[in-house]
Structure formats: structure tokens, C-alpha cells
């Protein structure tokens, strides 16, 4: 395998989130928006666990300003506030967002914890319209008020006034915008005494680490909890870079899980989890040892590892040897089900699709996006227009297309940083050190090939924090992909786990 081919999948984490960000990309509005906020409020009721819960939905744009007080943008959000609570000052409030960088939060909004959700097909392509939008019995409104936020340039959020892309499209710039929004929301709505939570997905977990630390350092706003759905804090753990074997090791147990799911193994065990434990051990011990030897590995050692790797992944020994024991994600997705004329997914590897080119070395598309993207786009537009009474005369942007223009250079603070280092685990560590009562919960999808579970486990076991703080971190696992809430049973489990997390973190 040449270095050039390996570089196709360098920064696999960005590939994961960039697909979400770039999918459904639309042109920006022709005219820059005015700097006046717009709001629409409506009253609703949802029944959760036999309890009728009235709530107010507030959809609108919040004006952001620079340090000189000049307007720079309007950030769109939808807030759901329980309306039968006399004193909201102590009721939990959660801020939710997706990733990208540059993705709207329609996925979490219309799929996870909001009062409504779009119905999709479990692990398969969802047929075209009409799509059903139903009351979401897994909503968290019985536990917390919810504020879904669209990143700048996505949804109905727009750069305005004196603002430019450079003010928002970067690690620290993006976090600063979210921090300003949250601070404004908390002050306007009298929620300073409320337990506060961040719930981010994918790059939204990366953002949460920076944002959680920033809120505490800049605004002295201490959070109760941060819930990370499909987490990535160190992008290098997902990068198939020349000379760096870590990603091959970290991805290997996920390859095994996907091969097991698609029944691509010659000797497929009945139970997944014991099989995954074997795969973890093999990856960390035998596989890692031979990879780290590099060119010093003997032919005998390579053959032995190739045989075991084939048994775990369903790839032929010959293919593994020709790949020099190093199969990157796109190659795996193209090769695993090639004999069936299919490629497997990245965001959710349970999804498969046909391909034009059965000879291609790497998978060029992700079946997941085609599988559910149409349903979510239709649902979020219809819901905003018809129920929230907002945005009918403008475009809801699934993405701002900012991934390729993102500023990864850090501005410093909250730990030791190096320019352009794609790692924010120090931000989270600093947030937990500053606030030793901050709880963190991580939600992992077993079939998530965008942010696999093993690199996440490695990151969270290497935060360098005290043992007492390490106890504040909880790991949860689901037999689903990147968006585990799209699987009916796992959406219930996710809801129960996050509800328990909010209850636990709110008791002080």
C-alpha cells in the first residue's frame, strides 16, 4: 500500500463528521441577514410514562457580538421548556448539538431526545416520503428542559453584521460562539441556578470538551454533566497516517464487530461481546507487537497475525498480507462484503449499499447518509415550518461546508497545547480538575466506524487526571452505530442511561 493511498483516509475522524457536515450542502442565502432577532413561541403537550407534560417551544435566533459589541451572527435554537413548573431556577437545562464541524443539529433534534422524532427503518434504508413524525416517548422533557443549537452557518444560523467565517469556523471560535449563546440564554431565562448539561454528538463531543472548559474559565459557569455521544477528543487516534500504526490497532475490534454482524466470519461465534473481548486482547497484544516491529517483523510473524486477523475480520489472509497487515477503514468497507456486491457503512456499519465499481479499493460513499438523510431533511423542514412556525421563507442548511476551511490551530489555555494538534482531551481534563464534581458519560456504538469505541477507551484512560476524578467518568455501549438513537431498542436504553445520568449529576 502506498503512502498516497493511505493519505486518502488520513483524518478518518474528519471523514466521519465531514460526511455529516457536507451531506445535503446548500448554498448560503444570497443576501446577508439583518441583525434583528426573530422568535416564534408555541404551546404543546406530550405524554411520557403516562404523564401529560405541557411545554413551550421557542424557536428563534440569538444575536452574537464581538468584543467591541458589534453584531457578528444570529444563532438558531429551539428550546423546550416545561410549562407546569413554577420555579424553573432549579430545574435542569441541557444544551444539545451535533458535530461536523459544520453540521446542523437536526439529527439529535429529530432523532433523540426532543418531543418529536422522525420514524426511520432500523439499520436499513428508509423509503422515500411520506415520512412520519411522531411524539417521542424517549424525550428527556420529564427530566430536563432542552435547547437544541445549530452551529453558525447551519440550520437557520447565519453570519451577520461585522461577522466573517473566520469568527466562527475554528475549534476555539466555534466554542466561543456556543459559550456566548449559552451564557446569553442562561441570563435571559433566569437559569443560573439550574443544573446545566452539555449533550454533544461526534464533533459535538470535541466541541463539548472545549466548551465545557471555556464556560467555566470565561463565564465561571460550572456544569453538572457532559454527555458525549459517539466521542472523539483526539483525532490522531482515528488517523491512518504513514508510519503511525495506532488507528489500525484501534479499529480492529470494530472490524470484528462489523464482520460478526454481517455474518462474514467462517467461524462466527454465537455471542458478540466475548468475541469482542478476544478481539480487543489480540489487537492490544499480538497485533500491536507485530505492527510496532515494522519492517523488522518476520514472514512467520506476519503470517501468524494475518491468519488471526482474517479470523476476526472476515478478510482473506491473502488480502491482509498484501495490505502489509494494515487495512484502513475505507478499504475494509469496500472489501468485507465485496463478494455480495455491497459496501458497508462508516457512520453505521450495519448499513450497506450497492456500488458501481466492485473492483474499487476503497468505499467512496457511506450508505448510512442515503439511508436516513432524506427522512431527516424532510422532517426538520416540515416540523420547523408547520409546528414551530419558523423559517418557511428561508433555507434550513444541513451543513455550512466549513470542514475544509476549519481552523484547527488552538488559541491556548486550559492545559498544554501545540498549534494545530487535533486533541482536546486536555480541555476536558482541565474542566474536570477545575470542577471536581463534573460528571461525564460516554455513549459508544459498537458498529460505529466513524468514532469507534476502542480509541475512545484509550483517550479516556489517558486523561492524566486523579483517580477520584476518573471515577466521575462512565462508559455505556449499544449494539448500534454512530447515532444509536435510530435503533428503537437502543433509543430506549440511551434515554434511560442519559436520564439516570442527569438525575445523578443534579443531586448535589
Give residue ranges: language-model regions:
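Alpha/beta-hydrolase fold catalytic core
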Residues: 293-450
Amino acid at each position: 500500500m502506498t503512502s498516497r493511498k493511505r493519505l486518502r483516509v488520513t483524518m478518518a475522524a474528519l471523514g466521519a463528521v465531514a460526511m455529516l457536515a457536507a451531506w445535503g450542502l446548500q448554498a448560503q442565502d444570497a443576501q446577508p441577514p439583518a441583525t434583528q432577532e426573530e422568535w416564534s413561541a408555541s404551546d404543546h403537550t406530550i405524554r411520557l410514562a403516562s404523564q401529560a407534560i405541557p411545554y413551550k417551544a421557542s424557536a428563534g435566533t440569538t444575536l452574537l457580538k464581538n468584543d467591541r459589541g458589534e453584531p457578528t451572527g444570529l444563532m438558531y435554537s429551539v428550546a423546550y421548556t416545561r410549562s407546569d413548573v413554577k420555579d424553573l431556577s432549579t430545574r435542569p437545562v441541557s444544551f444539545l448539538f451535533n458535530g461536523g464541524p459544520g453540521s446542523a443539529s437536526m439529527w439529535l433534534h429529530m432523532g433523540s431526545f426532543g418531543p418529536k422524532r422522525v420514524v426511520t427503518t432500523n439499520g436499513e434504508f428508509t423509503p422515500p416520503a411520506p415520512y412520519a413524525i411522531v411524539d417521542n416517548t424517549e424525550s428527556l422533557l420529564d427530566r430536563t428542559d432542552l435547547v437544541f443549537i445549530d452551529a453558525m452557518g447551519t440550520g437557520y444560523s447565519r453570519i451577520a453584521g461585522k461577522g466573517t467565517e473566520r469568527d466562527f469556523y475554528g475549534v476555539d471560535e466555534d466554542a466561543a460562539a456556543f459559550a456566548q449563546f449559552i451564557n446569553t440564554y442562561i441570563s435571559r431565562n433566569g437559569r443560573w441556578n439550574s443544573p446545566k448539561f452539555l449533550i454533544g454528538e461526534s464533533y459535538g463531543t470535541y466541541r463539548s470538551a472545549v466548551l465545557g472548559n471555556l464556560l467555566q474559565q470565561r463565564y465561571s459557569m460550572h456544569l453538572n454533566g457532559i454527555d458525549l455521544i459517539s466521542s472523539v477528543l483526539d483525532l490522531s487516534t482515528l488517523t491512518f497516517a504513514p508510519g503511525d500504526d495506532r488507528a489500525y490497532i484501534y479499529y480492529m475490534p470494530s472490524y470484528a464487530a462489523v464482520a460478526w454482524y454481517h455474518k462474514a466470519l467462517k467461524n462466527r461465534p454465537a455471542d458478540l461481546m466475548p468475541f469482542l473481548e478476544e478481539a480487543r486482547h489480540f489487537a492490544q497484544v499480538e497485533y500491536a507487537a507485530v505492527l510496532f516491529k515494522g519492517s523488522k517483523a518476520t514472514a512467520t510473524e506476519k503470517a501468524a497475525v494475518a491468519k488471526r486477523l482474517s479470523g476476526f475480520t472476515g478478510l482473506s489472509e491473502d488480502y491482509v498480507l498484501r495490505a502489509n497487515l494494515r487495512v484502513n477503514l475505507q478499504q475494509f468497507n469496500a472489501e468485507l462484503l465485496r463478494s455480495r456486491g455491497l459496501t458497508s457503512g462508516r457512520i453505521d456499519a450495519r448499513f450497506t449499499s450497492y456500488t458501481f465499481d466492485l473492483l474499487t479499493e476503497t468505499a467512496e460513499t457511506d450508505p448510512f447518509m442515503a439511508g436516513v438523510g432524506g427522512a431527516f431533511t424532510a422532517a426538520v423542514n416540515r416540523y420547523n415550518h408547520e409546528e414551530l412556525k419558523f423559517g418557511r421563507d428561508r433555507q434550513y442548511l444541513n451543513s455550512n461546508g466549513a470542514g475544509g476551511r476549519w481552523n484547527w490551530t488552538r488559541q491556548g489555555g486550559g492545559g498544554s497545547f501545540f498549534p494545530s494538534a487535533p486533541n482536546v482531551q486536555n480541555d476536558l481534563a482541565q474542566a474536570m480538575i477545575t470542577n471536581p464534581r463534573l460528571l461525564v458519560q460516554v455513549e459508544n456504538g459498537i458498529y460505529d466506524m466513524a468514532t469507534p469505541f476502542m480509541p475512545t477507551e484509550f483517550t479516556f484512560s489517558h486523561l492524566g487526571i486523579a483517580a477520584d476524578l476518573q471515577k466521575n467518568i462512565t462508559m455505556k455501549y449499544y449494539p448500534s452505530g454512530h447515532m444509536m438513537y435510530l435503533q428503537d431498542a437502543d433509543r430506549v436504553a440511551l434515554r434511560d442511561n442519559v436520564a439516570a445520568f442527569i438525575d445523578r449529576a443534579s443531586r448535589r
